[in-house]
């Protein structure tokens, strides 16, 4: 069965998207599911740090999109869980380096090898958000009790429902 793509998003930064993505990924991989995380936050990646993989990055998502690396070369295997992998975002690239169609292609290329593809979305509702939801089968919206965070989460729900 091909992987399910789940995007973890919110409208506001700092509500716990990256931590939630990492925790769900570890929980799924600990049960034996094959999991790959895609950091969709180009220019501001953090998922590699949260997962303890920041020193193992050779290639990133933009390298794959621009043809400098194959998808398999960008996959970083977790040190503790053999079924957990990461494809990091580029740290120093323009957010426009990846398009929604690029994300769909990458996810489709990964579907046969994994049970779950988790996409850590950047904050906001611009290009990075559109990229992150493009291939999603499911979306998890993370928020906290701040009025602005709940309002932004509601806006994200409306945008997703309109897709």
Where are these regions (language model features)?
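Flexible glycine-/small-residue-rich
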Residues: 10, 39, 88-91, 121, ...
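Glycine-/small-residue-rich active-site loops that bind phosphorylated ligands and cofactors
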Residues: 13, 94-95, 124, 148
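Residue-level recognition of oxygen-bearing side chains
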Residues: 20, 70, 124
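Conserved NTP-handling cores and scaffolds of large molecular machines
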Residues: 28, 32, 42, 54, ...
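Residues at the starts of beta-strands that form the adenosine-phosphate
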Residues: 34, 83, 138
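P-loop/Walker-type NTP enzyme "switch/lid" segment
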Residues: 37-112
